[in-house]
């Protein structure tokens, strides 16, 4: 392996913003914000995600509409659909 060309592989915590569930894993993701979280006495970078296995209908078995950016409402307004 050549030195200096590979991304850093560090421990990161992903947090599902709809359920609050946290997942500790390793990733090459860059630290985009200064958010950190402390788990088991150690501090990790925090990445917030909208959908994970804790909230996705396929994994939870529940049909629910996850729309954090208003896409569904925009579609309904555009095509005249009612709830």
From Swiss-Prot:
One Gene Ontology term, aspect cellular component: ribonucleoprotein complex
Lineage, top ranks: Bacteria, Pseudomonadati, Pseudomonadota, Gammaproteobacteria, Thiotrichales
GO molecular function, one term: structural constituent of ribosome
The organism's place on the tree of life at top rank: Bacteria
Keywords: Ribonucleoprotein, Ribosomal protein
Name of the molecule in the record: Large ribosomal subunit protein bL31B
Family label: Belongs to the bacterial ribosomal protein bL31 family. Type B subfamily.
One biological process term in Gene Ontology: translation
Oligomer status and interactors: Part of the 50S ribosomal subunit.
Primary gene name: rpmE2
């Amino acid at each position: 392996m050549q030195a200096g060309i590979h991304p850093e592989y560090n421990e990161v915590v992903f947090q599902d913003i709809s359920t609050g569930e946290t997942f500790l894993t390793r990733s090459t993701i860059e630290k985009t914000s200064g958010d950190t979280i402390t788990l088991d006495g150690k501090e990790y970078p925090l990445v917030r995600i909208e959908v994970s296995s804790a909230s996705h209908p396929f994994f939870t078995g529940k049909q629910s509409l996850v729309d954090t950016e208003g896409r569904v409402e925009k579609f309904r307004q555009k095509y005249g659909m009612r709830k």
